[in-house]
């Protein structure tokens, strides 16, 4: 409906140009059509007249009056008013909302989706956990946010490629290997011989036992077998990484998260991508030698200080493979690249972008885009559940899913803006009450399914065609409020895609569920009059469809029974 109003306003502006009220060469303003905070100010409002007033050399209210008079007539608009300094408020006719409800039924799963991305490719990288242990709840938030961002982008017409980057070539992998080797030798944490910086969780003992038992791990089609040799560090490293990568994959699968691409940091070295990145940076003239190290003059590109690329001992800093990895994304045709990271990685953003700009290979400024998430605090029984991988006090994503369930875990982890601190209340997530938002939303969907079953049990045949033809009967306030809420869904999908904020979908679904439950409690649905009954069931089915569409964007199920 916003598009309809934008079209009407644009036609009105053209009419003002034609009659000389506006200069013929004035540029069309980038006006806003939005829903007011309260419905007392109409269903939609625009600032178009205020933006045009200067070009027209007119008082904004006077120009607003002229624009209102120039608007084409539309049966979807019942009233237009001028408010404040020159806002124009639109009141929609019931027929507009009734037609929107019908569109939901006709479009089904596609309702709310758009083609703004035009099929272009966007790479979405998320989780990217080191393969050194099970996924913790922070990784879970990254997985939920990243997966939902990709789903929302798909709904906005983009071709989202989901990518997991494994840091399998750093110091952490060496510490992992030494930790497993110590366990293989029977050395426990805090005993003599335990490696400094070793991983202390009980899962290390699990890896060691599997390695010495000759267990096999099928990792994406490659079989890795425990060599049972306590001295073979290469074999231990290979098995430990494969074992823990597989464990992470199992957790992600249970969480409903999958990836198109698993990219290994080690492949950047093996395939010469790190060397290529260094060569491009040196060729661009933005590097220099100092103190036996190779530096990038990243301050030329907005970084707060220059960065070491190659240390005096000949090894590369983490910065170099990060830049090489993002260069590979550009070379693979990602018009957009989005990386979801914990907020503690904020310091790496400027240096990666600086490195990419310094290559001078055509990568635009602001590429890649970043979505940063804050920490998660998990509460149970009013007390915080501590998370500490290195100390071994380890509450994992798997633990959380087992306690709260997949749907509640996904919902709660994306329910707030990513850069907001998040408290996950396990007790609330397990409740089957209206206080639990995911239960409240899912129950609205199940309630419509129950209505249809009740109709069938009573021998009342639901005729969708008859319901569509009689939606005009539903002009009471509760029905129109529900239709109004339903009609917001395409705007929410678009806004979530632009802002990369899937929590907007969760917030909307809760508001839609509230509108539906309110309508349901105040509206007899299975009435004797078949036309009224079919119309009400059709409206209920429209609400159900939008609930299902939105829940799918969040990776949450839409149950038919609860």
Swiss-Prot record:
This protein's record includes keyword Nucleotide-binding: yes
Motif annotated as 'HIGH' region, chain positions: 129-139
Record carries keyword Aminoacyl-tRNA synthetase: yes
UniProt keyword list: Aminoacyl-tRNA synthetase, ATP-binding, Cytoplasm, Ligase, Nucleotide-binding, Protein biosynthesis
GO biological process terms on file: arginyl-tRNA aminoacylation
Main location per the UniProt record: cytoplasm
Cellular compartment(s): Cytoplasm
Short name of any one Pfam family annotated for the protein: tRNA-synt_1d
Gene Ontology CC entries for this record: cytoplasm
Listed GO MF terms: arginine-tRNA ligase activity; ATP binding
Catalysed reaction equations from the record: tRNA(Arg) + L-arginine + ATP = L-arginyl-tRNA(Arg) + AMP + diphosphate
Documented EC number(s): 6.1.1.19
Record family assignment: Belongs to the class-I aminoacyl-tRNA synthetase family.
Subunit architecture: Monomer.
Name of the protein in question: Arginine--tRNA ligase
Species annotation: Stenotrophomonas maltophilia (strain R551-3)
Species classification: Bacteria, Pseudomonadati, Pseudomonadota, Gammaproteobacteria, Lysobacterales
Gene assigned in the entry: argS
């Amino acid at each position: 409906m916003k598009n309809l109003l934008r079209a009407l306003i644009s036609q009105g502006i053209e009419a003002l140009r034609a009659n000389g009220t506006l200069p013929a060469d004035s540029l069309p303003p980038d006006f806003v059509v939005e829903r007011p905070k309260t419905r007392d100010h109409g269903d939609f409002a625009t600032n178009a007249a205020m933006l045009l007033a200067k070009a027209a050399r007119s008082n904004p209210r006077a120009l607003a009056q002229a624009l209102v008079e120039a608007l084409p007539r539309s049966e979807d608009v019942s009233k237009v008013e001028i408010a404040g300094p020159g806002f124009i408020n639109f009141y929609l006719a019931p027929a507009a909302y009734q037609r929107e409800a019908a569109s939901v039924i006709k479009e089904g799963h596609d309702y709310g989706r758009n083609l703004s991305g035009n099929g272009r490719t966007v790479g979405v990288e998320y989780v990217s956990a080191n393969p050194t242990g099970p996924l913790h709840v922070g990784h879970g938030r990254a997985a939920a946010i990243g997966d939902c961002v990709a789903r929302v982008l798909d709904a906005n017409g983009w071709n989202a490629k989901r990518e997991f980057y494994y840091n399998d070539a750093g110091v952490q992998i060496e510490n992992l290997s030494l930790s497993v080797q110590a366990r293989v030798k029977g050395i426990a944490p805090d005993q003599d011989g335990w490696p400094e910086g070793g991983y202390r969780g009980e899962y290390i003992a699990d890896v060691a036992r599997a390695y010495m038992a000759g267990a096999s791990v099928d990792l994406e089609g490659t079989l890795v077998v425990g060599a049972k040799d306590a001295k073979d560090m290469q074999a231990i490293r290979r098995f430990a990484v494969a074992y823990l990568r597989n464990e992470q994959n199992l957790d992600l699968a249970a969480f409903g998260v999958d990836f198109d691409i698993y990219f290994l940091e080690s492949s950047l070295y093996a395939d010469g991508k790190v060397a290529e990145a260094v060569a491009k940076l040196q060729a661009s003239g933005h590097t220099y030698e100092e103190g036996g190290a190779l530096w990038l003059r990243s301050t030329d590109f907005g970084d707060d200080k220059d960065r070491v690329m190659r240390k005096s001992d000949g090894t590369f800093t983490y910065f170099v493979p990060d830049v090489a990895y993002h260069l590979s994304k550009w070379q693979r045709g990602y018009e957009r690249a989005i990386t979801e990271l914990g907020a503690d990685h904020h310091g790496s953003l400027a240096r990666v972008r600086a490195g990419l700009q310094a290559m001078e290979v055509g990568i635009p400024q602001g590429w890649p885009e970043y979505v940063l998430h804050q920490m998660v605090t998990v509460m149970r029984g009013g007390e915080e559940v501590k998370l500490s991988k290195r100390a071994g006090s380890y509450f994992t994503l798997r633990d959380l899913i087992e306690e709260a369930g997949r749907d509640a875990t996904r919902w709660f982890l994306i329910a707030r803006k990513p850069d907001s601190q998040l408290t996950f209340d396990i007790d609330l997530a397990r409740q089957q009450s209206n206080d639990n938002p995911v239960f409240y939303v899912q129950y609205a969907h199940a309630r419509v399914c129950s209505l249809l079953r009740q109709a069938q049990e009573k021998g009342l045949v639901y005729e969708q065609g008859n319901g569509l033809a009689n939606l005009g009967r539903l002009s009471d306030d509760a029905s129109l409020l529900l239709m109004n809420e339903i009609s917001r869904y395409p705007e929410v999908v678009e806004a979530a895609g632009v802002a990369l904020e899937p929590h907007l979908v969760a917030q909307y679904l809760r508001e839609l569920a509230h509108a539906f439950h309110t309508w349901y409690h105040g509206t007899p649905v299975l009435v004797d009059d078949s036309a009224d009954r079919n119309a009400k069931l059709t409206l209920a089915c429209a609400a159900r469809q939008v609930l299902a569409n939105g829940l799918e964007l969040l990776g949450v199920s839409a149950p038919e029974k609860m």
